[in-house]
């Protein structure tokens, strides 16, 4: 049975793409069939998967707002997992999705056609709570949230939690938090320790015990 996981945080530079690519590679190495969806216009997950963005004929943009099928866009000859690639064309998708019908469920409908072929689908989200991220959360079964223990981190995390709550109520009642992953963790920093303590106070068991050091 396929599990779809969105890797999301509206703050940039917290390790979303690094988490997505390494998780995809790790799951693939353990003989799981994995699809990585690059939903960030920066396309760093695409580059990190060994695909040159400038050479793409099609990207996930063509899947979300065009007439192409997922098979038209899918790249299977890369790394140890399959990829739905992204490039800067995806910037325009935000505006075009806002004008279209069924705008929140485009990705879910696309993935529905192929999800039985995979054990895991990982979605690398953009660093904002826009229509692309909403598409990811509507399509997902769970959310992994990478975050740094830094100033304003909890404020941003609270905004994401509110978005997840709204999507659960309106569009995807089965969505759940898989866990919060602390990244770029600096144990020498007093601020890091303070935010880390607050994180456990607010979210408890939702915080992964494993962490990524700076």
Locate the predicted segments by residue.
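P-loop NTP-binding core
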Residues: 1-212
């Amino acid at each position: 049975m396929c599990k779809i996981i969105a890797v999301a945080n509206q703050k940039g530079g917290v390790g979303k793409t690094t988490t997505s690519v390494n998780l995809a590679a790790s799951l693939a190495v353990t003989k799981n069939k994995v699809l990585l969806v690059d939903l960030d216009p920066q396309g760093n997950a695409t580059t990190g998967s060994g695909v040159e963005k400038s050479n793409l004929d099609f990207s996930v943009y063509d899947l979300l707002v065009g007439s192409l099928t997922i098979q038209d866009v899918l790249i299977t000859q890369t790394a140890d997992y399959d990829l739905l690639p992204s490039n800067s064309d995806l910037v325009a998708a935000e505006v075009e999705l806002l004008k279209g019908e069924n705008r929140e469920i485009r990705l879910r409908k696309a993935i529905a056609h192929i999800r039985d072929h995979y054990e895991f689908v990982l979605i690398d989200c953009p660093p904002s709570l826009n229509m692309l991220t909403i598409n990811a959360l509507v399509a997902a079964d769970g959310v992994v949230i990478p975050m740094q223990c830094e100033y304003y981190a909890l404020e941003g995390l609270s905004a994401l939690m509110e978005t997840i709550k709204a999507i659960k109520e309106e569009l995807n009642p089965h969505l759940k938090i898989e866990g919060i992953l602390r990244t770029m963790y600096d144990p020498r920093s007093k601020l890091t320790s303070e935010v880390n303590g607050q994180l456990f106070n607010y979210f408890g068991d939702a915080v992964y015990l494993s962490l990524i050091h700076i």
